[in-house]
Design a protein with these regions (language model features):
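Basic, alpha-helical nucleic-acid-binding regions used in initiation and control of genome expression
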Residues: 64, 68, 81-150, 272
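Leucine-rich, amphipathic alpha-helical/linker segments
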Residues: 185-228, 233, 283-334, 392-399
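Elongated scaffolding segments in large macromolecular assemblies
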Residues: 308-399
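Long amphipathic alpha-helical scaffold regions
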Residues: 49, 57-60, 288-295, 342
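Accessory beta->alpha helical hairpin/"wing" motif in late/C-terminal subdomains of nucleic-acid enzymes
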Residues: 85-98, 102-103, 207, 251-256, ...
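N-terminal core-binding DNA-recognition domain of tyrosine recombinases/integrases
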Residues: 11-17, 24-108
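Short amphipathic alpha-helical interaction segments
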Residues: 64-72, 244-260, 341-365
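Short, amphipathic alpha-helical interface elements at domain boundaries
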Residues: 22-38, 42-57, 142-252, 325
Length: 399
């Protein structure tokens, strides 16, 4: 069967049902974006009917409504032999969602759309290798569409679909259409490039060498200081608080309790938590939790940028004085446009907090004169930067 031609289908509709042709033309142009009709997927149809149509497309005539537009599109798709997609256009789900938008507003309609989309089974889920972004670049969008199409085909074939397993396979296996590359590699490359090209020329210059260095996963390293603390807390159930530890040990205890949630207070003692036992039993989980923590703190993205610059400056094991480190971080972050003039005062707190974290964890040496990361600390910096660079893009709340 030949692929349906939109122009021919519209001409046929003009002859058979001229009252629907104009609205069908508008609907199909929005649906396809000028691409051939055979490239459309179920996800495309659902997103058009349940989001684009009620949010962006207005009725073409007085008294018209979105349900009429969807019925017009259904007739066009029927003529093209796309019965499954035509049925979606006139389904009770579509009618209910469009009425929800009309009667209860955009927020309620969007909520109904998201619930219905999840129920279709064609929405690729987040998987351990990749959390999908709200704002996708071209490569990620291509990966998302490809995974959705694979899910759709499996469902239509009547397979018992494990969405996560199929999505992971589709993302990680080499694809002939990508020249042997995988969609996951493409998405990671796109995200790394976007991260490098972030704010300001000074930051771009600092980040550029990391684009290649962060491409491959970083080998987890042992964290003996944290492991010892958790082991003590786990032995006989708790760790006495009356011990007089060093400042670094106090900071480690605070980090384990307040930032990781690995230990908790029990009167005059500290006891290991369920999560702490999980970390103690999995060096990989402990490494991931600690490295993600290095760039997770900060009430404002500015503080995260200061910590990020600190890690990049220290990642090669260079020896710097605390004053030099603060000055360089201020130079890098100052060019990102956060403030009219970023001063040392602005970066002092986030830099000092990060250095104290690294020192407490045994990942860096610091005193009043020098700061330097040892080899495990350099690996930790790379792992933290990689996780940050590969994070999904989210809409920024103005609240």
């Amino acid at each position: 069967m030949s692929a349906p031609d939109v122009t021919a289908l519209l001409a046929e509709l003009e002859r058979s049902q001229p009252d629907l042709a104009e609205e069908a033309r508008t609907a199909v142009e929005w649906l396809t974006g000028g691409e051939p009709l055979e490239t459309v997927t179920q996800l495309d149809v659902c997103e058009f009917l349940w989001y684009t149509l009620p949010i962006k497309v207005g009725p073409l005539r007085p008294g018209g409504d979105h349900e009429r537009l969807s019925r017009s599109l259904a007739r066009l798709l029927q003529l093209g032999g796309m019965e499954r997609y035509a049925a979606l256009c006139v389904s009770p789900t579509t009618a209910q969602i469009l009425r929800t938008y009309a009667q209860e507003g955009e927020d309620a309609g969007t909520s109904a759309y998201q619930k219905a989309l999840e129920a279709t089974g064609v929405l690729p889920p987040d998987v351990p290798e990749l959390q999908w972004s709200m704002i996708m670049g071209p490569e990620e969008l291509g990966a998302h569409v490809a995974c959705s199409a694979a899910l759709e085909l499996a469902i239509v074939a009547g397979d018992d679909v494990d969405r996560s397993a199929l999505t992971r396979r589709w993302l990680t296996e080499p694809r002939a259409e990508l020249g042997g590359d995988s969609w996951l590699n493409r998405v990671h490359g796109e995200r790394l490039n976007r991260w490098v090209l972030g704010r300001g020329p000074a930051r771009r210059e600092l980040a550029q060498p990391f684009e290649v260095r962060l491409y491959a996963p970083v080998t987890p390293q042992p964290l003996p200081a944290l492991r010892k603390l958790l082991s003590l807390a786990a032995s006989e159930g708790s760790l006495p608080l009356r011990l007089a530890p060093s400042p670094a040990a106090l900071r480690l205890r605070e980090l384990a309790e307040r930032e990781l949630g690995a230990i908790s207070r029990d009167g005059a003692r500290l006891a290991i938590t369920v999560y702490g036992r999980h970390l103690l039993g999995s060096p990989e989980a402990m490494w991931e939790a600690v490295t993600r923590l290095l760039l997770a703190r900060g009430e404002h993205e500015f503080e995260v940028s200061a910590r990020e610059a600190t890690l990049m400056l220290l990642a090669d094991g260079v020896l710097m004085s605390p004053a030099q480190l603060r000055e360089r971080v201020a130079e890098v972050v100052g060019g990102e446009g956060w403030h009219p003039a970023t001063s040392l005062d602005d970066v002092t707190a986030p830099v000092a907090d990060l250095v104290s974290q690294l020192t407490a964890l045994g990942l860096a040496y610091s005193d009043d004169l020098v700061v330097r990361m040892d080899r495990p600390g350099q690996y930790a910096a790379l792992a933290a930067l990689r996780a940050h660079a590969l994070r999904p893009r989210k809409y920024v709340s103005s609240g």
